[in-house]
Amino acid sequence: MAKMSALSIFAIFIILVLVIFEIPEIEAHDSECLKEYGGDVGFGFCAPKIFPTICYRNCQKDKGANGGKCLWGEGGKVKCLCDFCSNESFNQFISLT
């Protein structure tokens, strides 16, 4: 029975190590997917009433991306991030709050 318990503990330890080493790869994947379109693009580029946003359309047209997401910062600053991995048009806004 003690042999089975030691084997179970070893298996759990190996699984935890694999999970811990996998986490940085997931974070790096996001940075590879989202590339900035170019500086503070302003409110009109990401106006919520326009669907899909100009950011989304221009990222597809100008950069060859699958789409674009708007990142709203403090003081009304807006950045457009071109998304090269996902083409979900329903999730176009990222909030820092």
UniProtKB/Swiss-Prot annotation:
Instruction: Note the superkingdom of the native organism.
Output: Eukaryota
The reply to whether Isomerase figures as a keyword in the UniProt entry is no
Q: Does the keyword Membrane apply?
A: no
Gene Ontology cellular component annotations, sorted alphabetically: extracellular region; secretory vesicle
Q: Which cysteines are joined by disulfide bonds?
A: 33-85, 46-70, 55-80, 59-82
One GO molecular-function entry: sodium channel inhibitor activity
Signal peptide range equals 1-28
User: Outcome of residue 14 to T?
Assistant: In strain: cv. Cvi-1, cv. Fe-1a, cv. Nd-1 and cv. Wei-0
Task: Tell me what happens on changing residue 6 to V.
Answer: In strain: cv. Cvi-1, cv. Fe-1a, cv. Nd-1 and cv. Wei-0
Consequence of mutating residue 3 to T? In strain: cv. Cvi-1, cv. Fe-1a, cv. Nd-1 and cv. Wei-0
Q: Which Gene3D superfamilies match?
A: Knottin, scorpion toxin-like
Q: Per the similarity annotation, which family is this?
A: Belongs to the DEFL family. Protease inhibitor I18 (RTI/MTI-2) subfamily.
Q: What is this protein called?
A: Defensin-like protein 196
Organism of origin is Arabidopsis thaliana
Gene that encodes the chain = ATTI4
